[in-house]
From Swiss-Prot:
Organism: Salinibacter ruber (strain DSM 13855 / M31)
Entry GO terms, CC: cytosol
UniProt keyword list: RNA-binding, Transcription, Transcription antitermination, Transcription regulation
GO annotation (BP), single: DNA-templated transcription termination
Domain of life of the native organism: Bacteria
Name recorded for this polypeptide: Transcription antitermination protein NusB
Keyword Transcription regulation listed: yes
Disulfide-bonded cysteines: none
A Pfam family assignment: NusB
Length: 160
C-alpha cells in the first residue's frame, strides 16, 4: 500500500467521522490523520491538505456529484461513498500534481475495501463521468506528474 493510499484512507475516515458526528473538524483531523500518520510527515501533510481542501470544496463537489450520480441525491449516497466521491472530486479539481487516473483508481479501491460490495462499481461510474465532464469543461488543470494519463482522457472524451 502506498503512503498516499494510507493518507486517502485516513482522510476518508476523517470525512466520514466528521460528517457522522457533526463534530469538530480539527479534532477529527488530529485523531484520524495527524496521530496515525505522524511518523511520515509528507504523507501526513498530503492528508491534511486533502482533508482541508475537501471541506472547502464540499459544496461544489456535491453539486458535481449529484449531476453525475443519476437518480441519487447526495444525502442518499452511502456515507463512505459520498466521502470518497467528495475527496476524489476535490483531487481532480484542486490537486494539479495528482494524475486523474490515480484519484479515480484510489477512490475505487478504497470503496471496494471499506464500503458495500457494489460501491466500487458505483464510485467508478460516478467519478469517471465527473472526470470526463471536468475535462470537457476545461476544468482539469494538471501540471507535472498530474499530466500523466491526460492523453487517454482526451481520447476517451473525444470518442464519447
Amino acid at each position: 500500500m502506498s503512503s498516499r493510499r494510507d493518507a486517502r484512507e485516513q482522510v476518508m475516515k476523517t470525512l466520514y467521522a466528521n460528517e457522522q458526528t457533526d463534530g469538530d473538524a480539527e479534532q477529527a483531523l488530529h485523531a484520524l490523520v495527524r496521530v496515525p500518520l505522524d511518523e511520515d510527515p509528507s504523507t501526513r501533510d498530503f492528508a491534511e491538505h486533502l482533508f482541508r481542501e475537501t471541506l472547502k470544496t464540499m459544496e461544489e463537489a456535491d453539486e458535481i456529484i449529484e449531476k453525475h450520480a443519476d437518480n441519487w441525491e447526495i444525502h442518499r449516497i452511502a456515507a463512505i461513498d459520498r466521502s470518497l466521491l467528495r475527496m476524489a472530486t476535490t483531487e481532480l479539481l484542486k490537486f494539479e500534481e495528482v494524475p486523474p487516473k490515480v484519484s479515480v483508481d484510489e477512490a475505487i479501491e478504497i470503496a471496494k475495501r471499506y464500503s458495500t460490495p457494489r460501491s466500487g462499481t458505483f464510485v467508478n461510474g460516478v467519478i469517471d463521468a465527473i472526470l470526463l465532464d471536468l475535462h470537457d469543461q476545461g476544468r482539469l488543470n494538471k501540471t507535472g506528474r498530474g499530466l500523466i494519463g491526460m492523453d487517454t482522457i482526451q481520447e476517451r472524451a473525444g470518442s464519447s
